[in-house]
Structure formats: structure tokens, C-alpha cells
Amino acid sequence: MAERVHRKNTRPVKVGNLTIGGNDEIIIQSMTTTKTHDVEATVAEINRLEEAGCQIVRVACPDMRAAEAISEIKKRINIPLVVDIHFNYKFALKAIEGGADKIRINPGNIGKRENVEAVVKAAKEKGIPIRIGVNAGSLERHLLEKYGYPTADAMVESALHHIRILEELDFYDIIVSMKASDVRLAIEAYDKASRAFDYPLHLGITESGTLFAGTVKSAAGIGALLHMGIGNTLRISLSADPVEEVKVARELLKSFGLAANAATLISCPTCGRIEIDLISIANEVEEYISKIKAPIKVAVLGCAVNGPGEAREADIGIAGARGEGLLFMKGEIVRKVPEETMVEELKKEIDKLAEEHYAKQREAQPN
């Protein structure tokens, strides 16, 4: 079997102001749940997603009304916009004309070759990429007849077929996804894809389920791929508010040290020694740091005896005791604080560390 292409060695592809591939960065994506023709609702949801840390957003384009809304949506958002096209190539042309930063299609399902040529020509003129979205649930009939059922080899063959269509038209700004709802199938398909071509891979476990089940399933599948060095961009697909997809994605990337500017929470699993409401405190602190774009490690621990030593790697933290808390930095106790104010004191110190990071970033920027 061919050698696996590591994410940093994939072909770089520009999507708006971002580059996907050719580096170790993983770009977080999500998808709106609104009707795309409802511009107000769609823009509002995209803004919420951006605030949560989404870097690229995708919208459905099931009809011409949605395609015609792209130009107005694009004017009112800050992050790159991907438009999802199925079957009708005219929707793709209208979306590209409206300023889409990328389109997602299967070249094989938008009709005759002239249709594909028209879409590729429009994408070339605007300098935007195309994502080939292979899905185990919608493989071509001849592949299902050949393999008997959806397999990783069938998915890779489908991807290569669609890639070949674009390459024959001298188009190489391609991103590929290999989605399946079965975790093991998805892992195998992405692994084989990473050995078959060097285009960037968009990771996802499709139809993964509700917030709880989908988070576990996506973390299992995407986490395995990230550890293997596979993937340049990802979406956590959940039957939930899409903001939750972004939160899970950020947390997953933090677990692998792949989120450069994100705060991380350490909290103990609780036991009989705890004398503070650690669970609610941990949830409050987690929510507080979710929007902080600085690599700060924060600890919330329930035991003042072992806490500071156990969280020596944390930049800042609190350990609760009866009626008071210990504020510590890098495992060293800084001061005691009353229990009723210890969370606010922790937040103040987090803000100071974040501001120090932001100041360093500003200093490093060229004038």
C-alpha cells in the first residue's frame, strides 16, 4: 500500500482568506440549519457560529431562491462561505456568481459533461475550489454492484473518478471528503484516500446523532484520523444547535494539541473529599473560557491538599476547600480567596493572562 500523505504535505488550497492543506492547521467548519433564502436568519446563525470559533461555514442550496441569496449573505458575513450543490449545476453557477468561496458537489451527479465544464470554468474564473463530497450512503450504483455494499475501496474509487473528471478539465483546486456514519468504515476510507492522492481532506462522521451520541462517535472517528496525521479541515455533524458542533470541534483539536489559540479546562472527576460545588463551578469556567482565543490551561479542582500539585501543568487554577479556595499558577499557590469570590478572582486572572497573550500577538505583527 502507498505511503500515507500527512496533512502538512497535502496540496494547499485557498478558501477565501484561509489556506487548507500544506500545513498542520485544522480548519473548523459547520453548516447552517436555516433556510438559506432567509437571509436574516442565515446571517444571524453564521455570526453565532463565527463567535463560537467556526472558520468556514456551509449553506444548503436546494433551489434557485437559495442560490440567489448567496450574494447578500456573502456581503454580511466575515468567514468563507461554502455552498452545497446537488444535481442542478445552475445553482452552482449562480452561487459562484454571488461570491461563494467554495462549492461542494459531486461532478458525477450534476448531469452531462457540459454542465461540469460550465461549473469548473466559473470556479476557475473566480479562483475558488470545489469539494468532492463522497458519502457511503450515496455511492454510484455501479460501485455498489461491483463491491456488493459500501466499502472503503468503493468510496476511494468514487473519489478518484470525480477527481479525474476535474483534472481532465485542468482543475486542481480540490478538497475531498469521505463521509460515512460507520466509524470504522470512515477511518478506513480516509486512510486509503490519504494514500491515493494528496488533495486536502475534509473530515466528518455523517449522521453521527444527537449532541451526546454524536459527540462520542465523532470524537472516536475523527480523533483516530487526527492522531494518524490525516485531515485538514473538519465538521462535527450533530443533530443539535450547530454552535455545539463548533464547541466539540475546538475541544477535540485541543485534545491533540492542534488548536493554537484556545483555552483548555482541567477539572477533577469529583470524590467524597470535595466540599465545594465543583461541577457547577467547572461548567461556569468552561463557558467563560470558550471564547478566549489564547493558549491558556485552566484548572478547577476540588481538593486543596492535592489540587495544586496535580495541576502543575495548568497556567492558572483554583482548588476548593471548606469556605475558601487556593488560587495557584503553575502549581504554586498565589493566595487564598474566599469561596464566594474565588470564581470571579479566577476569571480576573484568566483575563490578565489572555491580555498578555494578545499583547504579544500585537507586538509580533508587522507594522
From Swiss-Prot:
InterPro entries from the UniProt entry: Dihydropteroate_synth-like_sf, IspG_bac, IspG_bac-typ, NO2/SO3_Rdtase_4Fe4S_sf
Enzyme Commission designation = 1.17.7.3
Q: Name one Pfam family in it.
A: GcpE
Q: Could you name the domain of life of the organism this protein comes from?
A: Bacteria
GO annotations under biological process?
isopentenyl diphosphate biosynthetic process, methylerythritol 4-phosphate pathway; terpenoid biosynthetic process
Per its record, the protein catalyses:
(2E)-4-hydroxy-3-methylbut-2-enyl diphosphate + oxidized [flavodoxin] + H2O + 2 H(+) = 2-C-methyl-D-erythritol 2,4-cyclic diphosphate + reduced [flavodoxin]
What function is annotated for this protein? Converts 2C-methyl-D-erythritol 2,4-cyclodiphosphate (ME-2,4cPP) into 1-hydroxy-2-methyl-2-(E)-butenyl 4-diphosphate.
Q: What is this protein called?
A: 4-hydroxy-3-methylbut-2-en-1-yl diphosphate synthase (flavodoxin)
Q: Please name the source species.
A: Shouchella clausii (strain KSM-K16)
